Amino acid sequence: APVVDDIDVALWQKFCLFAPMSGVTAAARCTLGDIKRDPHLNRLYKDGLAETAALGRALGVALPDDIETIMWDRLSGLPDSLRASTAIDIEAGRALEVDWISGAVARLSQDHDLDAPVHRTLNAVLQLWKDGRA
């Protein structure tokens, strides 16, 4: 694994990529290819990414100014068939970690007077399956 200068930045970069991917692929039952190609899913992902980055900055994480572009470029390089584990879990009827992903972004954003409508909505949609369903 590469050595990083600031572990908080590295963790938040990963969270910026993953949090909207998790929520969108689970709620829409889609792949990254769908997010890349569909303008509605594309916008939903990018807005969720911006919300996550804004929260990281509000928490004092020194994210790069162009984090949204960096993470979109990273997502664009991932296989189209990829889905977040949350999407796989929902289809398998397993419990979801939504409270710690989109739920956390929504909750912490509210605590810091930030609006996070994408994560608030993804959290609300996915709550129905939070405890799993067979």
Q: Where are the model-predicted features located?
A:
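Internal alpha-helical scaffold of NAD(P)-dependent oxidoreductase catalytic cores
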Residues: 1-66
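NAD(P)-dependent Rossmann-like dehydrogenase/reductase catalytic/cofactor-binding core
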Residues: 42-134
